[in-house]
Amino acid sequence: MPIMSAQWQEDSKANKQRWFLGHQDAIDFVNCFFDAVELWDDLIDKDVEVLDEHVNRAFLSLMFVLPANRWFVANYNYYQPLIMASINGFHDANEMSKSDKKHLRNLAFHIRNFGIEIHIATAFLIGGFEHMRKVSREIREFYAFEEFENA
């Protein structure tokens, strides 16, 4: 994943406040979880230098912070299938991205973003169906900013 600008980081923070209706435990869950996801991606695709600080932060988060997060604990059964589907999609995408077939590389480009569904599911759990529908397209557009040709 490319290094995101300070402006993008600020926009992300403001967006999460809106998307998740200021629910801090849910925001903390999403931030903690996706910090580890980004590390995993960087370790596999080796497109950026991985700092020891990021490794230490992600492992601390996965072993201590995430299991102690009240939002995650309360919604664990809802998230687990989404997390597993995201992990499976990540592995499939990494394999298909190496294909000599363009349609498989294109598919890989799209399924690697399945984790976005965790953001959308969080919006649903917090605000219900109408709230999810209100923010889901914006969430997709915010995170899916790369084009296939550049992937």
Regions found by a protein language model. Name each.
Residues 1-151:
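All-alpha prenyltransferase/terpene-synthase fold signal
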